[in-house]
């Protein structure tokens, strides 16, 4: 049986001991490269040594899944282009440029297929965040089977984690693809959110400032595991260790 990496990284979330170091997940790959592109993903795994890599998913005009946060490409210096209105071939021809920490990077769009190939090659688990996209949203999941097929193609069904703020999408996945692990993305958390996660056998991803020992206890009582996002400084990291959080998403954190 394949090793379930995500369960291993989450198992200490509710623990009270602060001796264990949290597992790190590279946010949109890492800081080193245009976000959500091949260079950022490879650097997240190879340079930083993150155990997981997170990407965002959008769909093109011809129904292909690509890694990007928005419908537009403005954060990469391209105006008046919308991913849902362009084919994959046309999208791949566009040069993406982004300056991060005073370093300018160039890249092309990364397909989800290539992202999963990188995860497999570097033995990291994928955290696939579903943004509202054509065919993958609360009202329409007709393109999700093609995304699932990519995960299956790379032999990552047991390792992959699906992350989204869209409840109905998660309910669809839990109903139709119960072998996939899911994370409910939240900024703030109410008891009702944790109860919903318990009912749907779904875990939770929480903005780091809203994680505290009381919330950890609430999750513990209902058997819900969680993750923290997005942590980029040592003091926040240490506070989460003290809270008992074992899994955090980061752009560039390096923990010795």
What are the residue ranges of the model-derived segments?
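Phosphate-group recognition and catalysis centered on beta-loop-alpha active-site segments
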Residues: 17-256
């Amino acid at each position: 049986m394949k090793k379930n990496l995500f369960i291993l990284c989450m198992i200490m979330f509710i623990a009270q001991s602060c001796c264990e170091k949290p597992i790190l997940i590279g946010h949109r790959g890492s800081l080193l490269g245009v976000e959500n592109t091949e260079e950022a993903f490879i650097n997240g795994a190879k340079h930083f040594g993150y155990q997981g890599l997170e990407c965002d998913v959008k769909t093109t005009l011809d129904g292909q899944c690509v890694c990007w946060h928005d419908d537009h490409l403005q954060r990469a210096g391209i105006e008046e282009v919308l991913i849902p209105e362009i084919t994959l071939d046309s999208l791949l021809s566009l040069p993406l440029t982004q300056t991060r920490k005073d370093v300018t990077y160039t890249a092309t769009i990364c397909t989800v297929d290539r992202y999963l190939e990188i995860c497999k090659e570097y033995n990291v688990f994928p955290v696939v965040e579903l943004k509202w996209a054509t065919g993958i949203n609360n009202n329409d999941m007709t393109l999700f089977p093609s995304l699932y097929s990519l995960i299956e193609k790379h032999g990552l069904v047991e390792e992959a984690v699906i992350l989204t703020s869209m409840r109905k999408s998660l309910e669809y996945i839990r109903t139709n693809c119960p072998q996939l692990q899911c994370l409910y993305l939240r900024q703030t958390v109410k008891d009702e959110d944790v109860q919903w996660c318990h009912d749907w056998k779904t875990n939770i991803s929480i903005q780091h400032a809203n994680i505290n020992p009381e919330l950890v206890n609430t999750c513990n009582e209902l058997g819900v595991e969680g993750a923290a996002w997005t942590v980029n400084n040592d003091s926040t990291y240490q506070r989460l260790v003290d809270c008992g959080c074992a899994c955090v998403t980061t752009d560039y954190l390096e923990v010795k």
